[in-house]
Amino acid sequence: MHKAGFVNIVGNPNVGKSTLMNQLVGERISIATSKAQTTRHRIMGIVNEEDAQIVFSDTPGVLKPNYKLQESMLAFSESALQDADVLLYVTDVVENPEKNEDFLDKVKKMTIPVLLLINKIDQSDQKTLGDTVERWHSLLPNAEILPISAKNKFGVDMLMRRIKELLPDSPPFFDKDQLTDKPARFFVSEIIREKILLYYDKEIPYSVEVKVESFKETDRNIDIHAVIYVERDSQKGIIIGHQGVALKKMSTEARKALEKFFGKSVYLHTFVKVDKDWRSSKRELDNFGYNPE
């Protein structure tokens, strides 16, 4: 009998959801950094086995939105509660469970299996972990609690076995050679944005959006033109840097990552433009693909 189903990953920012997603899928589907709000979209990663197809979805961290971009991010996370066969709620050993009570209340009312994953247990001792398990059990009494360390792959194989046990009998939903629902251009923009998150400080990375204007692939190489949008002229200056040094350095690292991702030579051309207050504009958010509908 073949099993198939949708397994959605939710939780607060910076608890390791994207790292877990990549470990489960076995491929680098979601960008992952130490900064909160790295994931902005809902991203699908598909695991295909002879007797099963597991469709994972990584989602943005749950937060109280301050502007329209964050409202869209929260909508992506809440949509993951509607169409899952199994829900993975990711927390860690230091998180305050009470900070998203509204979202937790929705999780508590779900009738599907909920696996509560306490991540980063490599950063904890037994007493702290025991206290954390007890606290979460009182908050989500119907959830099955599994301690893991996504970064070190501890508990990931056991988690995969448990997920397969919980999936319904079903034919596959996607072709067996399909890995994700996102096109190549999406991963280009995400990899560039990941390097911006790593190379720039403070508010700059959160004010940036990347759009691929041109993607031309041959057997030997890929030629990419990408625009980095910011909200202010001052941010444009910071991204470019003195004599263009900062932009060149970031773009070089992005090109190397893209070559590793695609397995061929990449010619990357980056440009910086100002799109004033794009994070608060519904029209611009729709243009950048932040419509959760």
Regions found by a protein language model. Name each.
Residues 51, 75-143, 216-218:
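Conserved C-terminal guanine-recognition region of P-loop GTPase G domains, centered on the G4
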Residues 30, 99, 171-175, 198-209:
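Active-site phosphate-binding and catalytic loops of NTP-dependent enzymes
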Residues 1-75, 79-81:
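Conserved G1/Walker A P-loop phosphate-binding module
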Residues 58, 119, 149:
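Active-site glycine-centered loops adjacent to acidic/histidine catalytic or metal-binding residues
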Residues 113, 122-180, 184:
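Canonical P-loop GTPase G-domain recognition
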Residues 39, 62-64, 96-97, 124-125, ...:
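Catalytic P-loop NTPase motifs of RecA-like helicase/translocase cores
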Residues 16, 155, 246:
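Conserved glycine(s) of the Walker
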Residues 184-293:
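P-loop NTP-binding site
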